Amino acid sequence: MSYSYAEKKRIRKEFGVLPHILDVPYLLSIQTESYKKFLTVDAAKGRLHSGLEIVLKQSFPVESKNGQYELHYVDYQIGEPTFDETECQVRGATYDAPLNVKLRLVVYNKDALPNEKIVEDIREEYVYMGDIPLMTTNGTFIINGTERVVVSQLHRSPGVFFSKDDSEEGAFSARIIPYRGSWLDFEFDSKGIIWARIDRKRKFCATVILKALGYTQEQILENFSESKTITFNSKGFALRLDNLSNMKGELLKFDIVDAQDNVIVKKNKKLTSRDVKKIKDAGVDSVAIDFDLVSTLRVAKDIVNEATGEVIAYANDDVTESLLESCVEVGMLELEVIDFITTERGRYISDTLKYDLTRNTDEALVEIYKVLRPGDPPAAASVKALFEGLFFIESRYSLSDIGRMKLNARLGSDKVSKDIYTLENSDIVGVIEELINIRDGKGKVDDIDHLGNRRVRSVGEMVENQFRIGLYRVEKGIRESMSLVHKDKLMPKDIVNSKPITAAIKEFFTSGALSQFMDQDNPLSEVTHKRRISALGPGGLSRDRAGFEVRDVHATHYGRLCPIETPEGPNIGLINSLASYARVNDYGFLEAPYRKVVDGKVTDEIEYLSAIDEDNYVIAQASTKLDENNHFVEDIIQCRSGGEAIFTESSRVQYMDVSAKQMVSAAAALIPFLEHDDANRVLMGANMQRQAVPTLKSEKPLVGTGMEKIVARDSGNCIIARNVGEVAEVDSNRIVIKVDTEKSQTSNLVDIYSLTKFKRSNKNTCINQRPIVNVGDKVEAGDILADGFATDFGELSLGHNLMVAFMPWNGYNFEDSILLSERIVKDDKYTSIHIEEFTCVARDTKLGPEEITADIPNVSESSLAKLDESGIVHIGANVEAGDILVAKITPKAEQQLTPEERLLRAIFNEKASNVVDSSLRMPSGTSGTVINVQVFENDKGGKSKRALKIEKELIDKARKDFDEEFAVIESVVKSSIEQEVVGAKIQKAKGLKKGAILTKEFLATLPLSKWLEISFEDEKLEEKVQNAREYYEEAKIAIDAKFEAKKKSITQSNELSPGVLKTVKVFVAIKKRIQPGDKMAGRHGNKGVVSRVLPVEDMPYMEDGTPVDVCLNPLGIPSRMNIGQILEAHLGLASYGLGKKIEKTLEKTRKAAELRKTLEEVYNSVGDKKVNLEALNDEEILTLCDNLKGGVPIATPVFDGAKEEDIKSLLKIGGFATNGQMKLFDGRTGKPFDRHVTVGYMYMLKLDHLVDDKMHARSTGSYSLVTQQPLGGKAQFGGQRFGEMEVWALQAYGAAYTLREMLTVKSDDIAGRSKMYKNIVDGKLTMNVDVPESFNVLRNEVRALGIDMDFDYSSEEE
């Protein structure tokens, strides 16, 4: 087994038993693949069914009303973005690119005859069709400078669905749902009548739709019912027994007798195959029935007197005595009737026809028109056009390929081609037939929560739909323009207005429910947000109406949606996370991977199955035991089939799970010993990992699951090597790799990776990248070169490993509180950097422009000490609450001045009184260091000194970067040819004769550009030098071009909002240490608040004097059933012990052979998966041992982790008791505790619920306008609510004066509080109470009811 660069430095011991079959697919592919499909830029790869192409093809050609112009679509191109991703974030711009569409305008001769079209002219050009947002490499969008994610939506798939309502009668209904267009419903009522609805409007008979499709009453009956022939004569009535086999299973309503009057089959019996044979053998072809039975029947076809052409009876008329007499009169002794005798099937449609008052297609169309457009007078043309537009015109109605596939599959017919996306007559007939079958018990209703009936709509599809909406508006505009614009040579640009497209797309990205501000607490929260699947949003469910069934875990979720990770609040079950191996297929259905089983042998062939396919197979679990030939060991094994867990013979198994973790999401797969935790707690654990705050220094978890490196790799926060090569240069800002062109598929000699430094995330945490490679290191493609935030050697590291003791300590861990050691604070383990952004905007007001300046009236010099001459704070300044960050003045209205004031103003030239200080100040409760300042201003007034200074710094930095990049390229080019050219014969060189030998000394005097001008006699060498020369010159041109482009983007003027003159952004880094009140958690849902930070000397300690870091309450475990944390603590202790063992060996010797023995015992004495230490050289072994001193990292994959025996064996090797308990001593007294305590290493996280963000106090502040009471909440600088129950408490104590103060001056007594403030200033301690404002509000409300109520103050005066 080979190890990557980062893995060699720290190998994780893995405990999994199951073989590794399939790598976890790229975690962000659901985002990137979907948008790539929408935005197929490369026309050569075929854009036939890509998003943009198909929308444009469907929308064009557009024809003018008079038919003279036709606009055709030819092709499209997506241009280059104006700014790159980083610049867009800095400038608050959108990362997008212009869409240019090639349109062809065909002009026809207007004098031609009506039916002929003569082309007069064809004009083609590219037309700008708005800007399309581009996706970043990490699957996000930058909209107005902020990073956003478009969450995928799980919605009901297009197709037909049959359901049964929850009422007592249990009425059945069918619904045809298109991808876009009107919904069509059919439903039974309690009487068995079939009704139809279009778009949930008023219901009408289902047969009206059939008549509107052109079916006659006779054809409808023929389609939906059987007919039987009755013969009649003077003896009575007889029913012909045709199609006896169709009658099997039906209840007989009469005796069947043979010619001798022997009863063959009795009445009220269900007919069997044996009965049918008996009847045939007896030669019975008809049976006598009485008139009572005949009178319940109806005519199947119109009865016409052939002699006169007169209609005696219409189809569906009742059979009556008068009808029979009329038939006898014209000599008809046979009657074709609807078969109600042997089956009830035909009665539903027959009864519906009785209710249906329409007689033909025209009347049916009018009836539908009246339902959809009540009040509109129906005109013949509009009636037909409306009905056809509902279901039969593709621009208005589309089932899409998914809907057509589902409809054909559900109706079990392929009569309709899969390329037809509108409804056909046979579809509607088929749906009604299937509905009748379900009512008759011959079919099943659909399970709407089955993942075969719900599909994922990803970002590409949503943007495609928005684009279609915008293009539809553009299309209407084009038609109008064609008829309005009168120009000699009309061009496509003249008639296309692209604003509706831009508006539709902008609306979706800025205010759409599924376009969300990216959750960026840490890399895991980013990945999880991008893999989120929501059932909410437009066209989805609403959380108020969603019932329990929709939210519940369904059998088809297995391997597709995680059954664990979902929010805890009102959205529970509506927002899900994609399972780790799941993918979305071309139809939008979720698929899970399985290993194929052939003839009882499990192969390594992987097949992805959707929920629909999976129902038909028997699937074994990943943990099923196999022998060395991959055959099942046991004869009877546990499997899944059709959503049920079953035990079955191994010969019946068709597929097997790929991995034990395939049913859970990425976040849940990070929880070790997940299988030992209660599901509710795991849910909390998975959700809380997303809230972990990245700390100053990341530390890998000692006990992990092996999923850490996958999440870190796919999050995009680490820098990954693109090619094989050697590290040429490393500093904190960049890594330069000299590429090995022989092993890499690239012609680049150099790869340069720029690192992100101290960038603010969406959640105000600090994004910073640190290199982990050294100069001279050899790297492979895919190796981690630099760690991002919350990663350690390419592994996700959200918290720290702490030594935990499960014991009470003086009540400080009551109710999940956490007792922390002061060592944790001292070592800055949970210290985090938060970057806050403060913005100051100078606007043009009615009274004049606001100004950012250091010249501010009535402000002391000390307050301006941290500002530069432009009035903006210096970078590096330490700022406290109330400090000025940006000094700004705003003009205020001129006041009438007295002559004296005017004189003083003139003498002192004082203009201070007509401006007001509106500076940006540091908010209360915060302090930090200014790390960056950005200034954006319009060019109209010229740039300020600070803006020019920032601009110059950026240009100098860019120049330096590009110069360094070029220097590296030069050195790489030099080293690639130097050895070969020294000692070679010269063909031509300045200063040397032909045939001379080139020396190293001569080369040292020349710059590289002169080297490359030398030509050599050796042709092969000459060719190599020629290639190097070309590469060097191309690189020089490319770097100069890149610098010019960068310089242009830096100096380019900023587009500010209207009325804004200047915007200044100040970034302040705030350091937050852990303190009492902060929330912490483990990975098993074990959360708590820090109650006290205890000095190290007072903490309980072990026999060797090592103090523990944390005391947790043991009572928090039994009731919560998250035992995984105990197992994690035991395994963590073992890991720590193994680290100590390696450290002791290192202290004794640094010989690789001895260290290998220790590592062999540590890694390979326990567990099935061995570590190949032979793959590491001696130097790498030493580095590995140095990195393992703090503990040997262990991976225990979910559902396939370490067993109890493994943990005990490791504890023994690590030198601890196998029960994981030990004697602890009280730090205060030195005495041992009565009982042994469970001690171990647990991975603890600091969550983004910091006490600093919640602490808040107010003395005076803003008040509510109506009630005049103080506002609530920290954001409004509000006060503490003194509620009803608090009032009762004061009443109970009889604290009358305190109560009066609370309800008046401290709340809404306006006059009283002003007086009180004045009294405090004057040093008086009296309190005058007035009428509280809420009484005035009450009085006004009573007056609104017409009652004049007022307060009577007279008694007080008397």
From Swiss-Prot:
An example Gene Ontology CC term for this record: DNA-directed RNA polymerase complex
What residue ranges are annotated as transmembrane?
none
> Coiled coil: which residue ranges?
none
What Gene Ontology terms for biological process does this UniProt record contain? Answer: DNA-templated transcription
GO molecular-function term, one example from the UniProt record: ribonucleoside binding
Instruction: Cite the EC number.
Output: 2.7.7.6
What keywords tag this UniProt record?
Answer: DNA-directed RNA polymerase, Nucleotidyltransferase, Transcription, Transferase
Q: List the catalysed reactions.
A: RNA(n) + a ribonucleoside 5'-triphosphate = RNA(n+1) + diphosphate
Secretion signal, residue range per the UniProt entry: none
Record note on quaternary structure: The RNAP catalytic core consists of 2 alpha, 1 beta, 1 beta' and 1 omega subunit. When a sigma factor is associated with the core the holoenzyme is formed, which can initiate transcription.
- State the family it belongs to: Belongs to the RNA polymerase beta chain family.
Q: What does this protein do?
A: DNA-dependent RNA polymerase catalyzes the transcription of DNA into RNA using the four ribonucleoside triphosphates as substrates.
Q: What is this protein called?
A: DNA-directed RNA polymerase subunit beta
